[in-house]
Regions:
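Active-site loop-to-helix "anion-binding N-cap" substructures in soluble metabolic enzymes
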Residues: 1-239
Length: 239
């Protein structure tokens, strides 16, 4: 077979426009199409959804692993199911928080997300004790509360660091939670999934990346999949 390395497809306006003409042009270079990029499956672009109309299309091994591992969270997870949502952007996390308010046993939010939370506080929503927009880490009381919940969980999803982990003085919360999840995962008491660029970077910095059950390669794609149960790129392969 032949290999052809293409330039960044987004330099062509037809990629993001999901142009049928551009999708056909891409399809003309191959006999089959394999999508192995979970991290871009939330985009309805020519190389992700458009091309599947013109070639026999399949999910690659990495994409299949992402789907099967994330479905362990969304479809009949072993309970209690606990979800930890961190980071600073509430808007991008809101759909997945609201989804898990309906389906998870516990949903824990970082101090910054807690400070900005103005929606319904359901019984399973656990806000940080230090709800402050200036807060750069969860405090000791919150760490203990979160760890007690994790201790009695059987499945944990974590998306978003719990503090400004880049600075050593603000990594304590993220470190404590990462170590607790890693410890329980390694002793087979917990199935753990972690995802998102900052979360993965923080856990890698702590040297714990290989201590979790599954590390997702998706950030926005993972959040959308968890909220909706599918993605445009995955749906396109199923048609």
């Amino acid at each position: 077979g032949n290999y052809e390395l293409l330039e960044n497809l987004r330099f062509n306006s037809g990629e993001e426009e999901n142009s049928e003409e551009f999708a056909k042009e891409l399809a003309s270079k191959a006999q089959i199409y394999v999508n192995d990029s979970f991290a871009t499956c939330h985009r309805s672009h020519a190389s992700i959804t458009g091309i599947t109309k013109f070639l026999p299309s399949f999910a690659g091994i990495s994409l299949q692993k992402e789907i099967s591992n994330l479905k362990k969270i969304t479809e009949n997870p072993e309970r209690p199911l606990s979800v930890i949502i961190g980071g600073s952007k509430l808007e991008s996390k809101l759909p997945v928080i609201e989804k898990f308010q309906k389906t998870a046993d516990y949903v824990m939010l970082s101090s910054l997300l807690s400070a900005n939370w103005s929606k319904e506080i359901t019984q399973n929503l656990i806000l940080s004790d230090n709800k402050d927009i200036e807060s750069k880490d969860i405090n000791e009381k919150t760490r203990q509360k979160f760890m007690e919940i994790i201790e009695k969980s059987r499945t944990v999803l974590w998306a978003g660091p719990l503090g400004m982990y880049e600075e050593e003085k603000y990594i304590a919360g993220t470190k404590a939670i990462a170590e607790k999840i890693a410890e329980l995962t390694q002793s087979n008491k917990l199935y753990s999934v972690v995802g998102g660029g900052d979360t993965v970077a923080a856990i890698n910095k702590l040297g714990l990346l290989n201590k979790f059950s599954f590390v997702s390669g998706g950030g926005s794609a993972m959040l959308e999949f968890l909220a909706k149960g599918t993605l445009p790129g995955i749906e396109a392969l199923e048609k």
